[in-house]
Swiss-Prot record:
Highest taxon of source: Bacteria
Name by which UniProt lists this protein: Large ribosomal subunit protein uL1
Role according to the record: Binds directly to 23S rRNA. The L1 stalk is quite mobile in the ribosome, and is involved in E site tRNA release.
Keyword field contains Repressor: yes
Protein's gene: rplA
InterPro entries found in the cross-reference section: Ribosom_uL1_bac-type, Ribosomal_uL1, Ribosomal_uL1-like, Ribosomal_uL1/biogenesis, Ribosomal_uL1_3-a/b-sand, Ribosomal_uL1_CS
Lineage, opening ranks: Bacteria, Bacillati, Cyanobacteriota, Cyanophyceae, Synechococcales
A GO term, aspect molecular function: structural constituent of ribosome
Length: 235
């Protein structure tokens, strides 16, 4: 078992073995995020689904009201005049078969891959490279589209794709330690609503299992999911 560093051990003593109210949990996470850089705040949510069944898979996108605080590199595989449109819209990498070949050779210098439908037969051949990294374009995720410019704009502005992994756990980066706890909660609430809205049709029993938040270099804190779901803004 890996031994905790002195810093992590000290931070862990500030966290009680209980479920926390959302804003209290976020306050603790922010307080513990004292590294020499602006730590990323993450959510790790275990759902009552078994993704090996197609009707229990979760993969979708959400636009967080305060963005993620991160800049992402977007690659676009398209053809014809759409290549210049991708460049004009701010894509970091763009091309046709040349980009397909580059990726196939190991060029993975991007965080998100968008493709137009006409290029998907060629992109499909990259499944071995893209699949394990969760980068294969998908219509449900908004990454297979003819509206390249709008897709790039939305993802650059904070739209993000998330999915449940093989264990039914959703991992999402939803802000930075420099965000206010209220902004972090707004993002978290939006994420919760998206997960509920996109509940797989085959999900059985208890849908929400556990809900933890953490920072890049800090310990995790368990959230009260009911308090997140039941929250109603004043007025």
């Amino acid at each position: 078992m890996k031994k905790l560093s002195k810093r992590m051990a000290a931070l862990s003593t500030k966290i009680e073995d209980r479920i926390y109210a959302p804003l209290e949990a976020l306050s603790i996470i922010k307080e513990n995020a004292n590294a020499k850089f602006d730590e990323t705040i993450e959510a790790h949510i275990r759902l009552g689904i078994d993704p090996k069944y197609t009707d229990q898979q979760l993969r979708t996108t959400v636009v967080l009201p305060h963005g993620t605080g991160q800049s992402i590199k977007i690659a676009v595989i398209t053809s014809g005049e759409n290549v210049s449109k991708a460049k004009a819209a701010g894509a970091d990498l763009f091309g046709e078969e040349d980009l397909v070949e580059s990726i196939n050779k190991g060029n993975m210098e991007f965080d998100l891959l968008i493709a137009t439908p006409d290029m998907m037969p060629k992109v499909a051949k990259l499944g071995r490279v893209l699949g394990p990294r969760g980068l294969m374009p998908n219509p449900k995720a908004g990454t297979v589209t003819n509206d390249i410019a709008n897709a790039i704009k939305e993802f650059k502005a904070g739209k993000l794709e998330f999915r449940a992994d093989k264990a039914g756990i959703v991992h999402v980066r939803f802000g930075k330690a420099s965000f206010t706890k209220e902004a972090l909660f707004d993002n978290l609430k939006t994420l919760q609503e998206s997960i509920d809205k996109n509940k797989p049709s085959g999900a059985k029993g208890k849908y929400w299992k556990t809900f933890y938040v953490t920072s890049t270099m800090g310990p995790s804190v368990q959230l009260d999911i009911n308090a997140v779901q039941d929250y109603q803004p004043e007025g």
